[in-house]
Amino acid sequence: MATALEGGKAATPRTLVVNGERFEHIKFTNFKNLEKPLTDILRSVNPSNSAVVFDIDETILINDPKIDACYHARPNPGIMKIYRLCLRLQIAVYFVTARRLSDENYEWTTKQLQCIGAGKYAELHMCPESYRVSAAKISEFKKRARARIMRKSKRQIVLNAGDQWTDTLQMSSIKECNAFIEKDNKSYWLFQPIDREVVWQLKLPDRGGY
């Protein structure tokens, strides 16, 4: 992994081990310092065989019960910048969410994405009820969804972003999930998995999404 700037200084990648798998990672304290590395990553890939995956809640949008617009949600400005850059570069966008899969939820979610300005995407993957029993099972669903996207589309996922550790890392148990929840959840973590299918993983500050 190349070094990236954090507050004007070169940030040195560190190694994290999860389930025996090694990840190079850099922590950013704010989106401003992260924006250029993300932009450089997306501009460096071939858009014809690349894809980006976003979580929905507290990632592409922020749920806010105090507002009436867009079904009580507003766009997340930083992630929307990355979303719009993907569209300009013609990189396929996919959404993978732990929202329960149903016809009603699907219709509501598509309307909400359209309302916040994120209505252009290749596919929306929602979570079957059988996976919504634990954080570990949700992480399994999301991993399977990403694998399915790459298999069907013949595209490489170059960036996968979400606000929960289960959005980005495969967790095998609730205990392991809880251990990660206790880590620094107020920073941005940019991971480069070693020998994994997704090129970059982005963990956003935890806003209580799923």
PLM feature spans:
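Non-catalytic pre-domain segments flanking phosphatase-related domains
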Residues: 1-54
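C-terminal cap/substrate-recognition subdomain and adjoining C-terminal extension
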Residues: 2, 8-11, 104-210
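Acidic/histidine-rich, surface-exposed loop or edge segments in extracytoplasmic proteins
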Residues: 16-22, 61-67, 89, 126
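Second-shell loop/turn segments in exported
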Residues: 22-27, 65-72, 94-100, 131-136
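Structured segments of extracytoplasmic/periplasmic soluble domains
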Residues: 41, 63, 82-92, 112-116, ...
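A general structural motif
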Residues: 47-49, 90, 155-157
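Asp-based phosphoryl-transfer active-site loop
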Residues: 48-66
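Short, acidic loop-to-helix structural element flanking the phosphoryl-transfer center
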Residues: 67-94, 101-107
